[in-house]
Amino acid sequence: MSRRGTAEEKTAKSDPIYRNRLVNMLINRILKHGKKSLAYQILYRAMKKIQQKTETNPLSVLRQAIRRVTPDIAVKARRASGSTHPVPIEIGSTQGRALAIRWLLGASRKRPGRNMAFKLSSELVDATKGRGGAIRKREETHRMAEANRAFAHFR
């Protein structure tokens, strides 16, 4: 029996402008080499570009993009009877949101374009419309899970 106390679950802080935890999670994933002010700059410029492109609330666009990209199921490698099988596993909301943010940023970094703010805004707008690299990644993950449904009993 462990003598350690249970770790307190940390809640994500909200950012200063939008007062939203989701925005802060995104900023922390954009962050590179400890340059948080640059991460704030990138995201706020992207939000401004979204406002100009769609003429709607950029926060709702961000929420919708993340909701569209969030996977329901993923594939995890499990070792059973001497061989490794890809086993489909359901994903919780927190982990799904984290994956969605990671995929959105990965897809926007791969995009051709001028700067990160422009690429991120384009990716978020595309994700709300059901296209883009992050949506492709989600569909690919769901396809993999569907193809390996036979191994679902290995959970």
Swiss-Prot record:
Cellular localization per UniProt: Plastid, Chloroplast
Record keywords: Chloroplast, Plastid, Ribonucleoprotein, Ribosomal protein, RNA-binding, rRNA-binding
Superkingdom, taxonomy of origin: Eukaryota
GO molecular function, one term: rRNA binding
Gene3D superfamilies for the chain: Ribosomal protein S7 domain
Keyword Cell cycle included in the entry's annotation: no
Disulfide pattern: none
Protein name per Swiss-Prot or TrEMBL: Small ribosomal subunit protein uS7cz/uS7cy
Organism: Oenothera argillicola
Gene name as annotated: rps7-A
